Swiss-Prot record:
GO terms for molecular function: aspartic-type endopeptidase activity; nucleic acid binding. It comes from Homo sapiens (Human). One of its GO terms (biological process) is viral translational frameshifting. Its EC number is 3.4.23.50. Gene3D superfamilies: Acid Proteases (2.40.70.10). Autoproteolytically processed at the N-terminus. Expected C-terminal autoprocessing not detected. The sequence shown is that of the processed Pro protein. Coiled coil: none annotated. This is Endogenous retrovirus group K member 7 Pro protein. The active site is at D26. It comes from the Eukaryota. The keyword Hydrolase applies.
Length: 156
């Protein structure tokens, strides 16, 4: 599973005890939280001994009485003992994200800052193609080595 940062929220599916849930990937949350209206009535829960901070005022906060088996978005095996409260959507916190091997990466730019400034001064608009109608290639051309002409002074 991969998601680019955009105006859309990063949501993914997980299967907990055989039941599918969709939740928001939340790297700022220490623990995963299931919305009270999605928690199956026959699954045991207890009043939580600790409160939740950062999600507004939650009057009823519960926690699963059991540690539950979970499959991540790419079938990663994990366990979770989620909190349960009245929130509009489920949150996948770092307790699950770490077990799933989640990582945040920021790729290095393809071009140096100097070359980017030169291209911008020449009228290049990032994401658009080169040329009069901005419909040319949008990705760098990959250099390919010609094995027959490799090195200095190749044979004639």
């Amino acid at each position: 599973w991969a998601s680019q940062v955009s105006e859309n929220r990063p949501v993914c599916k997980a299967i907990i005890q055989g039941k599918q849930f969709e939740g928001l990937v939340d790297t700022g949350a220490d623990v995963s939280i299931i919305a009270l209206n999605q928690w199956p009535k026959n699954w045991p829960k207890q009043k939580a001994v600790t409160g939740l901070v950062g999600i507004g005022t939650a009057s009823e906060v519960y926690q699963s009485t059991e540690i539950l088996h979970c499959l991540g978005p790419d079938n990663q095996e994990s366990t979770v003992q989620p909190m349960i409260t009245s929130i509009p959507l489920n949150l996948w916190g770092r307790d699950l994200l770490q077990q799933w091997g989640a990582e945040i990466t920021m790729p290095a730019p393809l071009y140096s800052p100097t070359s980017q400034k030169i291209m911008t001064k020449m009228g290049y608009i990032p994401g658009k193609g080169l040329g009069k109608n901005e419909d040319g290639i949008k990705v760098p051309v990959e250099a390919k080595i010609n094995q027959e002409r490799e090195g200095i002074g190749y044979p004639f």
